[in-house]
Amino acid sequence: MLQPKRTKFRKVQTGRNRGLAKGTDVSFGEFGLKAVGRGRLTARQIEAARRAMTRHVKRQGKIWIRVFPDKPITEKPLEVRQGKGKGNVEYWVAQIQPGKVMYEMGGVPEELAREAFRLAARKLPFKTTFVTKQVM
């Protein structure tokens, strides 16, 4: 699973997921999977989508992951009363805003990339769209 090696603080406040995304263009590959909705992407979801894509393209071409889970999410154990401090870090998430390109792929035909991204999108908790590199 993806998670930071070191962090300045162990736990963070919940905060809000507002604003517009950075990284809205396909930079590395030829095709990309772009978020239409907003939400949290856990390390497990990132890995599940990566596996789905890799298996479909049978390890040809190259896949770039453009998101990294850098926010810790805490949970208190089941059947524990409220109070007594904040819970332990259970998993890590990446906050995604609309327009963010999450995955990129290159070195494969467009139809293969489109189908691989469709399979990956089924693993993600919000709507996505297929994009291609803009040639100027």
From Swiss-Prot:
The keyword Iron-sulfur does not apply. SUPFAM superfamilies: Ribosomal protein L16p/L10e. Keywords: Ribonucleoprotein, Ribosomal protein, RNA-binding, rRNA-binding, tRNA-binding. One of its GO terms (cellular component) is cytosolic large ribosomal subunit. GO terms for molecular function: rRNA binding; structural constituent of ribosome; tRNA binding. GO terms for biological process: translation. PROSITE patterns: RIBOSOMAL_L16_1. Gene3D superfamilies: Ribosomal protein L10e/L16 (3.90.1170.10). It comes from the Bacteria. Part of the 50S ribosomal subunit. Binds 23S rRNA and is also seen to make contacts with the A and possibly P site tRNAs. PANTHER family: 50S/60S RIBOSOMAL PROTEIN L16, LARGE RIBOSOMAL SUBUNIT PROTEIN UL16M. Belongs to the universal ribosomal protein uL16 family. This is Large ribosomal subunit protein uL16. The lineage of its organism: Bacteria, Pseudomonadati, Pseudomonadota, Gammaproteobacteria, Vibrionales. The gene is rplP.
